[in-house]
């Protein structure tokens, strides 16, 4: 028998916000109106829209309950991971993704946690792709893979659903693949 041990396993957390449909109906028109009225000459993504850095989005009154939900989930994830102190939300923003939009590989160092909440995600949404840090060293080299699994895959994609919150360590490099749907 060969024993194995997971070294430095990483937990990625998912929680579902129950009043997601109600929040979606309320805030999607507000966010689309903000995009329409934005006079900035430089857009963050072609064919999409990202409002980043102007404010902490979750401080708006319309997001009060969602912010409380996210704060609670992140604190529970933090404790479950065995970390000390209490994390606090530093920034939040929104992106509107349309056909052909994407977001390249990046992370949000030096914080502790990153998270993505999906206000609206249809079944064709590409989800959140987390990049395996072990692959940066070209492991497993030239041997190939008999099957892809959590150990040898270069990335894992977390499905996106309306109302889902995905929380992961900030050091994890992540991306959003090209959007293929028309929405």
Task: Set out the residue ranges of the language-model regions.
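Catalytic core of non-heme Fe(II) oxygenases with the double-stranded beta-helix
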Residues: 97-167
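Contiguous segments within soluble domain cores/interaction surfaces
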Residues: 55-57, 80, 95, 122-125
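Conserved small/polar residues in nucleotide/adenosyl-binding loops
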Residues: 173-180
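A short coil-to-beta-strand element that immediately follows conserved catalytic motifs
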Residues: 83-92
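Non-heme Fe(II)/2-oxoglutarate
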Residues: 1-81, 102
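A generic structural micro-feature
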Residues: 7, 86, 107-111, 181
